[in-house]
């Protein structure tokens, strides 16, 4: 065995033994060892200087041993570097591990606004009664908002609703009734009656105070079919009120006037605070006004191409804010819109 071969064997054994001694976190020690063995001025280079003394016949053999030693040592350094990196990552993960036995921190969650809750509850009542929920436009044509509701341009009842006009013919809707007009236009009555509600935001030129707002929410209902009577309306209203305010509640109908219904009524509900005895909530009357209603005016039906001698219907409308204020004892409508978290958190 030549001297060079002995040197190569010794270098391999010493280097591999040194690599096994290097621990995680000592990457610099490994790098220094690599330079001292495989670098330009390293041990392997020094051994190669002895090739000049090797005979021509032995040089290919010794050269092969040198290349094998270089390959083995290079692979050993790469494998050691990989193992050190894996140990480093494992140690880092262990130091950053989460103790799942520690108590968690509660996450603050939001909740639906009280008006959204009220609207969804009312919609669920009607869906359970077979009504469909129909949405419509907030920016509406004067024709659908007024004329289709039996309110021509010169009708004095238009003064009852101060309106936000965008142009002479375009406005912010003052009620959700235009949705009903379009629904009557589109409905195929040969397939059965129309039963729908139209919830949404409406706008009127009111001065904002504790009981008025320039924008508020309405849910209007409409049923049109054959042989629809005032008794059907009264039974429907009684059922709605009991589902919203309790089974013990009763209703009272008072004559009123709306251009799009005839006859028209105001609907009162027996006071849920005093049971009809008289208190500050019902202003000592025992009754609380809750909504308006009536039988659909024949002229409104005819404008949708519906034969008023064959078909009839009833309509009603109530405000979500009004319902929420009564149910939760809220005395200022502005609380719904001011974004005060202290107000909203009461209705989680």
Swiss-Prot record:
Keyword presence, Nucleotide-binding: yes
Record: residues binding Mg(2+): 262
Q: Tell me the keywords, alphabetical order.
A: Aminoacyl-tRNA synthetase, ATP-binding, Cytoplasm, Ligase, Magnesium, Metal-binding, Nucleotide-binding, Protein biosynthesis
Enzyme Commission no? 6.1.1.20
Keyword Cytoplasm on entry? yes
Catalysed reaction equations from the record: tRNA(Phe) + L-phenylalanine + ATP = L-phenylalanyl-tRNA(Phe) + AMP + diphosphate + H(+)
PANTHER family on file: PHENYLALANINE--TRNA LIGASE, MITOCHONDRIAL, PHENYLALANYL-TRNA SYNTHETASE
Name of the protein: Phenylalanine--tRNA ligase alpha subunit
Native organism: Streptococcus pneumoniae serotype 4 (strain ATCC BAA-334 / TIGR4)
